[in-house]
Amino acid sequence: MCADQPAVLTQHRAIAAEGWRIELQTPRTFLESLKVMRIGAKEVAEHRDGLSLLDPMVVWLSRLGLFSRSEAPKPDSYAITGQIKDFGVKLDSTPGFLWMVSDGNDRITQVNAGRAYARVQLAATAHGVVMQPMQQALQEFAEVARPYADVHRLLQASPPAQTVQMWARVGFAAPVG
């Protein structure tokens, strides 16, 4: 967490924003996300993997055939710039971040990190804490090399000996239901 360290929190937010922007404005990476995007409750229930998107406007655009998963929006389109702006507002209100760093990066380590994150997510939820993974800056494509290096430096993880396996923004939300 970093709510009591405003300068560190600002760095986390800036790296997350840059990773988000790069992924959205790089057509091939945006298309990767579209391929695993689950739009609406029905798709989420049918496919328990991938990215869940429940925004009513997007659900209706998809139902009407006006939301393409085969073509990325132009980087300067409202679909992209609007998401970047909206997410910037969310990041600005983020009170903290959580991260998991491992020694090494073999498949067993990756799976164990995922299992540990799932346990943390469940415990956090039980206490009213919400988490959103910020994996954009942890990916390994050329365009995101700078945010990747920045987040590893910020978290004092030295690749390849150490890997940031999970990085999430955390905060509080009203109970659902």
Label every model-predicted segment.
Residues 1-177:
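Acidic, surface-exposed loops and disordered segments
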